[in-house]
Amino acid sequence: MIIFQKKDVIPIIIPQICFNDKYDNINNYVEMNPSLFIDEKGNVRILVRCVNYKKLPDKHFTLYESKSNSIYYNITGIIHDSDKLDIETFDYTILDYEYNLPIFPSYWRGLEDIRFIDANNILVIIPELNEGGNPSILKAEINNNRITHFCHCKPNIVEKNWMPYFNNTNNYKVIYSLHPFIIKSIENDDLQEIELSETTKNKLVGYHGSTNGITINKYERLFLIHINRNITHHRWLLFNIKTNTITLSEEFVFFKNSYIEFTCSLVNYNNRIFVSIGVNDNKAFIIETCYTDIIELFPKCNNEENLPTIITMLYDIRSMENNTTERNRKLESYIDFSCKFLLKLPFPLIIFIDDNEETYDAIYNARKDANLLDNTYIYVCDFKSTYFYKHLSRLHELQQSFHILNGEIEHETPLYVILNNNKFDCIDRTIQLNPFNSSHFIWMDFGINHVAQSTDYIYEWIHKVPDKIKQLCINPYTETNSPKTHFQCIYHNMAGGLFSGSIENMKKYSELFKNKTEEIYNDNWYQIDEAVMTMVHRENPHLFELYYGDYRGIVSNYLYPVHNIDLIFKSSQKYLDYNKTKETHSLLCYCAKYFEMNPHCDFVFYYIQQNIITNYYNNNRLLLPNVINLINSKINSDIEHDKERIHILLENNRTNIEYYENKALILLPAAKM
């Protein structure tokens, strides 16, 4: 059995409530089933239920008065940001309540198992407010140390564990039951059954509700549910209120030796998740955990081919800026472009979007129409909560003092810079979540096919993503002046629209990018993401495996050149001009397949020439076999012009060729090399 990983366990020890029991002994109430709420400012309220009975492992219990009685302690205090939840400094008082409804005879007295709806509204079980004296759900208001204004919720039958959640339409609902899976509004009898798969239905048999639901993003709510066997087992339940789908975690327990575990509350405070839990009906705790540890218990999507996950995002920053200039493409055009390529790819895809229902629907429907929902994860994330958004005011300041000479300040706005930098925040979040259990990841701009051509080449390389960061180099950064001086202009050295790598290398790239960004901001300048990537590459070349071309070939050129061979040879010549033979050799090896398929291309002579220069230093004094084959094919060509050109090339490089140990493989009928 899985024991859930916990960041912290906070015991709740309350002042004892003593009484003379029915055996004429001094006895005391025992604490159990706490409820918890923390507001945005860190104000904490813990309600601890105390009872006059003790439950045993064999399900029997001992009652110490004639009837079961339940009393609540109200514990209040405050938590600051990342500080430990220290309830020893909190205030403890007995909770007061005032019924405004008739009281009926019941074996159970008092309030039971409170669940917070929000800071001032609760759901509570009160048998003595039910005509039959049975457990019954009521809604009530809580203010300070007092609960009032009780009202019945319908249908008022024994479904004890309703789970409230915010429905995103300015109202609250509850999960009323799990099997069948039914939701409803809080007070009205408007049950709505949601159809689930048979597999999911079977997993929910015997399960009951536990906690309220916390908001993970606009459409996803996280709950805890439980089942009582010989001991209590739990599952996390993730409910998508947009698609009416649920995902269940593996079963687990919180503690190794407990036999009863009852959770009433979940709280998400500053991305710290707290669970209130009663153990064995005689102990109360608060557990702190995090979403990363929770999501680890969810089964990963079936990815038998170990396909990489493609990561992308779509945020309408121009609407945030109220910017309607023609220079900036509208969101609709990005979606139109993506429907022709990215959104129809049959590979694992995670898309980060803002809290925008139209965007969500457009993406969801496009993937649904393509029957690709199983390979789709839509991650709703407020742009203001992303990692690089914290730099907004700093970028406004930097743009006043540091000017990119060929930049367009109306286009490269602070939000634009933040948006592109946030590729790495999306990468970090995806690796943390890893919904498709991938070992490798690909960043791909959402509207990449606006510039990319021959994009179907992705089907050739999607299974061949290397561990190293594979990224397009357009213009090698060989210049020797300081980065701050050099990057007063945008040079598009590296293309930021597509790059890939293993988990570890993508995490490392993200860390290096974040550090470099902080470094240049602290040096009072900034640049767009591609320039920062270029600097990271220059300082960490071992981390990268470059491919070459221009934006036109950003998808197609991944394995070998398809487009831009002319530009690629400008890059190789630039390397040579700076005496970077290793980089030139690597580029030429990347081009080998191109010339295998295009031996009559005019650039083949540049290819041969540069290999003659670089192979000696980078291939153990041996000309590459494919280079020798190309030389010999030109020597024996039926095209006189090719014969003349290769003869001139070899004559001009006679001295260099003499140093190669395999020069004898060159077929020269007219001269010995």
Predicted regions and their residues:
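GT-A fold catalytic core of metal-dependent nucleotide-sugar glycosyltransferases
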Residues: 415, 419-472
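Beta-propeller domains
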Residues: 1-303
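Alpha-helical repeat scaffolds
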Residues: 585-591, 621-638, 642-647, 673
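Amphipathic alpha-helical repeat scaffolds of TPR domains
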Residues: 564-574, 589, 601-614, 625-629, ...
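Catalytic core and acceptor-binding pocket of nucleotide-sugar-dependent glycosyltransferases
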Residues: 448-454, 464-467, 471-472, 476-477, ...
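Short, aromatic/basic amphipathic alpha-helical patches
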Residues: 359-374, 392-394, 627
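N-proximal low-complexity "stem/linker" segments adjacent to membrane-targeting elements
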Residues: 303-333
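Active-site-proximal specificity loops/subdomain of glycosyltransferases
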Residues: 371-433
